[in-house]
């Protein structure tokens, strides 16, 4: 009985130490890092830490199968890096531009709809991962895409040489 109670006391002591330690292993992002372009007029928005986490989770669940690391598996010439997003027509280097694209995607030159080829809200019946995404979800996914170049720099959208 004494052995059992000493093991129990040791286990409780260990649990107490583990539960009171406050280690944070996630990267802490300051406001400057979490600031991303909202619209083409130059307005910006500061993402909350919760939006950052949610955007990453939603991107990984809905987009990363084709865009892991900011690449585009079906067209390696066009990635999610800031340069590619900024050169698209219409530009997609803002939250507003990316949300519009996720709702109704167009070709890189903006000439034609590609909703039947690219997952979007418009084609949610074909791409079920898009079905339940709200405008807030799209906002946080766009925030994640625009935040990544600040965190992983040229690796985001850099392609095979980095991944």
From Swiss-Prot:
GO terms for biological process: photosynthesis, light reaction; respiratory electron transport chain. Binds 1 heme c group covalently per subunit. Pfam families: Cytochrom_C550. Heme c binds at residues 63, 66-67, 118. One of the extrinsic, lumenal subunits of photosystem II (PSII). PSII is a light-driven water plastoquinone oxidoreductase, using light energy to abstract electrons from H(2)O, generating a proton gradient subsequently used for ATP formation. The extrinsic proteins stabilize the structure of photosystem II oxygen-evolving complex (OEC), the ion environment of oxygen evolution and protect the OEC against heat-induced inactivation. Belongs to the cytochrome c family. PsbV subfamily. This is Photosystem II extrinsic protein V. The gene is psbV.
């Amino acid at each position: 009985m004494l052995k059992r109670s000493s093991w129990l006391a040791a286990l409780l002591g260990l649990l107490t130490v583990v539960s009171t330690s406050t280690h944070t292993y996630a990267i802490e992002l300051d406001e400057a890092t979490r600031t991303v372009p909202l619209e083409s007029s130059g307005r910006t928005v500061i993402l909350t830490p919760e939006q950052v986490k949610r955007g990453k989770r939603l991107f990984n669940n809905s987009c990363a199968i084709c865009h892991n690391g900011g690449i585009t598996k079906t067209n390696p010439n066009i990635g999610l890096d800031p340069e590619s997003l900024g050169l698209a027509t219409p530009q997609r280097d803002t939250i507003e531009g990316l949300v519009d694209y996720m709702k109704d995607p167009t070709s890189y030159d903006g000439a034609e709809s590609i909703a039947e080829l690219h997952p979007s809200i418009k084609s949610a019946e074909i791409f079920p991962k898009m079905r339940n995404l709200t405008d807030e979800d799209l906002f946080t996914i766009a925030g994640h895409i625009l935040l990544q170049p600040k965190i992983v720099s040229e690796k985001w959208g850099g392609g095979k040489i980095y991944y």
